[in-house]
Design a protein with these regions (language model features):
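Amphipathic alpha-helical interaction motifs in eukaryotic regulatory proteins
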Residues: 1, 66-69, 73, 93, ...
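Basic, alpha-helical interaction scaffolds
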Residues: 33-102
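Short, conserved micro-motifs composed of acidic
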Residues: 2-39
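Amphipathic alpha-helical
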Residues: 168-206
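Short, charged alpha-helical motifs in flexible N/C-terminal segments and linkers
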Residues: 1-15, 110-175
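Acidic, serine/threonine- and proline-rich low-complexity regulatory regions
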Residues: 73-85, 102-107, 133-146
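Short conserved micro-motifs at the rims of enzyme active sites and ligand-binding pockets
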Residues: 26-28, 54-58, 167-168, 213-217
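Short, conserved catalytic/metal-binding micro-motifs enriched in Asp/Glu and His
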Residues: 41-51, 65, 92, 96-104, ...
Length: 217
């Protein structure tokens, strides 16, 4: 290649993004080596699946939080709460926020496992059992946002970044401002994108528009 880049065939995979099952995929070769077709692949820290549901990634996050929950339970008597909180923000919070704007809008069926394990970890930090402390009080006591609040926070950060720190082309592509009938000089509503499939309600674009409108209300 002219730019002196070479393809690492051993790390190269093929994936077809489609909502339907496709069989008998064509054989693709590069320099005589057959490239493998895959249904999921990890790229830049996120597991991408052929249907773009990001459920495999959610499952990986759930599994990691489950392992960390066991760690917190084991060490809660050994280290002070401040240390537990430092570990929480380093390992748990860091895992949660990584690419959350991409996969965080998944359905509650899949997200519930993350929320349950997050609650368990915070109970270990506070050294309380289930029922000893209301969930809202648990988060308030540690000054930690709940899962969906974390997701909304990062969506709002993305909206602010696109609206105020990027060229107008970002606004034109991602967000369509609607005139305010009550205050004509304001454009504080964003039109929700048209969707054809339920899975599109999980998209970053749809949820960015939704959360900014809720925030304005």
């Amino acid at each position: 290649m002219n730019n002196k880049l070479t393809v690492n065939v051993d790390k190269t995979k093929l994936m077809l993004f489609t909502p339907r099952s496709v069989h008998n995929m064509p054989i693709v070769q590069y320099n005589g080596v057959v490239i493998e077709w895959v249904k999921t692949i990890k790229y830049l820290g996120i597991t991408i699946d052929e249907n773009l549901t990001f459920v495999p990634h959610v499952n990986e996050v759930t599994k990691k939080l489950s392992q960390l929950s066991g760690v917190f339970y084991s060490i809660k008597y050994l280290v002070p709460r401040t240390t537990l909180l430092n570990i929480f923000y380093s390992l748990v919070y860091g895992t949660l926020i990584q690419n959350i704007i991409i996969w965080g809008g998944n359905s509650e069926v899949h997200i519930r496992g993350i929320r349950v394990r997050l609650n368990n970890i915070l109970r270990s930090i506070m050294n309380v059992k289930v029922g000893d402390l209301d969930t809202n009080d648990l988060y308030n006591a540690l000054d930690i946002l709940k899962y969906y609040d974390i997701y909304k926070l990062f969506l709002l950060k993305l909206v602010h970044f696109c609206l105020y720190q990027r060229p107008d082309v970002f606004q034109e592509h991602f967000f369509h401002l609607m005139p305010n009938d009550r205050y004509p000089t304001r454009n504080n509503k964003i039109k929700l994108p048209q969707i054809r499939l339920n899975i599109e309600k999980q998209s970053t674009n749809f949820n960015c528009c939704k959360v900014i409108n809720e925030f304005e209300n």
